[in-house]
Regions:
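Hydrophobic/aromatic residues positioned on beta-strands within the core alpha/beta folds
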Residues: 77-79
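As written
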Residues: 60, 90-98
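Active-site residues of response regulator receiver
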Residues: 52
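Short amphipathic alpha-helix used as the core "switch/output" element in two-component signaling
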Residues: 39, 61-72
């Protein structure tokens, strides 16, 4: 079972994403901030990270850089309510960019595709 780490400072979104991804057969872990997410990556490496950009403390862009510095083989999906970040070249290092929505279809499909692609490359 593939393990997905969800890093988002909004509890209701963490729960929504966790519920939908588990429904699709993924194991999930959740982190309320980037620091906690990075700890999980060190101690219990996930197969994929769903990462919010705007969070208190360390933002998702800095966390993305730290994830890539540690292990650039873990796919990262940037997930944000602000589509303007898509133009920020710092976000281009992510494997995918999804704009937050109450409809999780795009996020779930993106996770599936990236994990499938990652399995083929491994």
């Amino acid at each position: 079972m593939k393990k997905v780490l969800i890093v988002d400072d909004e509890p209701h979104l963490r729960l929504l994403y966790e519920t939908e991804l588990r429904r699709e057969g993924f194991e999930t872990m959740t982190a309320a901030n980037a620091e906690q997410g990075l700890e999980y990556i060190e101690t219990m490496p996930p197969d994929l990270v769903v990462l919010d950009i705007r969070m208190a403390g360390m933002d998702g862009i800095e966390a993305l850089q730290r994830i890539l510095d540690r292990d650039n083989t873990i796919p990262v999906v940037l997930n944000t309510a602000y589509s303007s970040y898509k133009e920020n070249f710092m976000t281009w290092a992510a494997d995918a960019y999804v704009t937050k929505s109450s409809d999780t279809t795009e996020l779930v499909e993106t996770v599936k595709e990236l994990l499938q692609d990652h399995a083929v490359q491994a």
